[in-house]
């Protein structure tokens, strides 16, 4: 009887014993300060956006989120200056009209560390950001590009990480911007009315 009690007491002590620190084996998400957007080979030249028919490409390295693979999401952002202060979404949401956008997203959400875009898309975006019309479009302009990275979670997103900024020299041209055509949805059912 004493032997069983002693054995039970010894086993229960072993169950409650634990390592002093077991964090070394658990992966920990670390948010890096920055990551690298590779300078494209066309960055040293002036890109004529009107005559460029091939797509332009960007590539970057995945941020180091602690040494293990993470399914990060990326968005390519373009700015008319090197500031990246007010986004197009923030300016659109401002009811007073006091905020003017100085950057906008060139891409939708990406999961690869590369992106191909058309010169026309870049031209339309910088024309919209600068508010150019046919009379005041410049022969040459500087455009600044960076990549935003984040990890989507069920509660939203983690901290956002931004890449370095790459300066591109472009020769823009005028494109008449127009509002997008409305999407018509033909819905059927009692809940629609």
Regions found by a protein language model. Name each.
Residues 1-18:
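Sec-dependent bacterial lipoprotein signal peptides
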Residues 17-77, 83-193:
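Insoluble glucan recognition modules
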């Amino acid at each position: 009887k004493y032997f069983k009690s002693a054995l039970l007491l010894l086993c229960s002590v072993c169950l409650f014993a634990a390592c002093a620190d077991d964090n070394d084996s658990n992966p920990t998400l670390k948010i890096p300060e920055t990551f690298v957007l590779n300078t494209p080979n066309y960055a040293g030249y002036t890109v004529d956006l009107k005559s460029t028919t091939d797509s332009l490409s960007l590539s970057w390295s995945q941020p180091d989120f602690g040494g293990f693979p993470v399914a990060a999401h990326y968005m390519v952002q373009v700015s008319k200056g090197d500031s990246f202060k007010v986004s197009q979404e923030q300016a659109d949401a401002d009811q007073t009209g006091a905020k003017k956008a100085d950057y906008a997203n060139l891409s939708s959400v990406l999961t690869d560390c590369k992106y191909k875009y058309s010169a026309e898309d870049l031209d339309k975006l910088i024309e919209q950001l600068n508010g150019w019309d046919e009379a005041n479009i410049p022969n040459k302009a500087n455009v600044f590009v960076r990549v935003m990275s984040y990890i989507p979670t069920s509660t939203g997103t983690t901290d956002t990480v931004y890449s370095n900024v790459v300066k591109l020299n472009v020769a823009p041209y005028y494109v008449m911007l127009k509002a997008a055509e409305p999407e018509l949805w033909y819905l059927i059912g009692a809940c629609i009315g």
